[in-house]
Amino acid sequence: MANEKFIRNKTHLNVGTIGHVDHGKTTLTAAITQVLSARGLAKSRAYDQIDNAPEERERGITIKTSHVEYETEKRHYAHVDCPGHADYVKNMITGAAQMDAAILVVSGADSVMPQTREHILLARQVGVPKIVVFLNKCDLSPDEQILELVEMEVRELLSQYDFPGDDIPVIRGSALKALEGDAHYVAQVNKLIETLDTYIEDPVREVDKPFLMPVEDVFTITGRGTVVTGRVERGQVKAGDEVEIVGLKETRKTIVTAVEMFKKDLEFAQAGDNVGALLRGINREDVQRGQVLAKPGSVKPHSKFIAQVYVLTKEEGGRHTAFFSQYRPQFYFRTTDITGVVELQGDVKMVMPGDNAELVVTLNNPIAIEEGTKFSIREGGKTVGAGSVSKLLN
């Protein structure tokens, strides 16, 4: 039997729950599905179904993640919840689950905790555009003044990391009580869902962003010219478009004279398509794997940047020992490995397997990167870490 068709009649949004361990992220995820299933918009998922997350691999790293989907009258949501703190760090840094928005869950009974801070910082560094706060376990802390203080503390923390702390919606509730059917708390979960629909704008679809395609392979078609193949990362391209070849060498302009998919001419290619693009006046040796084709002026080559990285543990197949400044691994961006030198930041003297660290990286060759670009760190073809560019330095 054919798989059920995905009906695209609503805007799709990716969200995730973040926050300190045991503050109620998974319980809230279960409560959202239960409340929406009562309106016929979701399948109710029990706590242990979500908590029993399957393992996935992204950029050579194993991550436990639960994916839950639900709809509102306005949107279709894909919601990601991770069981362990390390899974969150890995998930956000590798971009395994790109979030258009995050629901920060803070226990009203415990207030801000270390991972609350760490998850907000990560959300800032990997470019999560919007955060909504759910103050959970308010049934355990009925004192209004205490809840006011907790809310104030959360808002201050968000402002500290450049989120609009004063304007972010904070919804008070109890995920557990909502699951038990308490009418007041069910209404608060409904209020959270309504807030997701109204406070978070529709994301700009990848198709509408400026064209970019990493070059995977290059070959010559006799009598026609040079063809580069790859998967369109974002935007669209059609015959007659001017593009730039960016990275590794001097940036060059050319015209795309044809776009093909599975040996058939395409009117245009868009984000997600695997295509071949025929380039005018370009020799085979002018372009190579690791470069990108991009809309002119949309992306520049860079070789020095600040990155947020997660270093794999020995058990995850990573290094057995720490590394220091002047460490020289390969950085795998999109389709290629480039050697680079690492400098540790601040008073950090070494980075241990399992650490989440900020590094300055200088690559041997400039390549097309932007803030938010993801990469793997490799040694001899083996993944030892994953990172995200947080700031360009040249």
Swiss-Prot record:
Keywords: Cytoplasm, Elongation factor, GTP-binding, Hydrolase, Magnesium, Metal-binding, Nucleotide-binding, Protein biosynthesis. Residues 136-139 are annotated as: G4. It holds the Pfam family GTP_EFTU_D3. Residues 81-84 are annotated as: G3. Its EC number is 3.6.5.3. Residues 60-64 are annotated as: G2. It is an enzyme of class 3 (hydrolase). Residues 174-176 are annotated as: G5. It is found in: Cytoplasm. GO terms for molecular function: GTP binding; GTPase activity; translation elongation factor activity. Mg(2+) binds at residue 26. Residues 19-26 are annotated as: G1. GTP binds at residues 19-26, 81-85, 136-139. The keyword Mitochondrion does not apply. It catalyses: GTP + H2O = GDP + phosphate + H(+). Residues 10-204 form the tr-type G domain. One of its GO terms (cellular component) is cytosol. Belongs to the TRAFAC class translation factor GTPase superfamily. Classic translation factor GTPase family. EF-Tu/EF-1A subfamily. GTP hydrolase that promotes the GTP-dependent binding of aminoacyl-tRNA to the A-site of ribosomes during protein biosynthesis. Monomer. HAMAP family: EF_Tu_B. This is Elongation factor Tu. The gene is tuf.
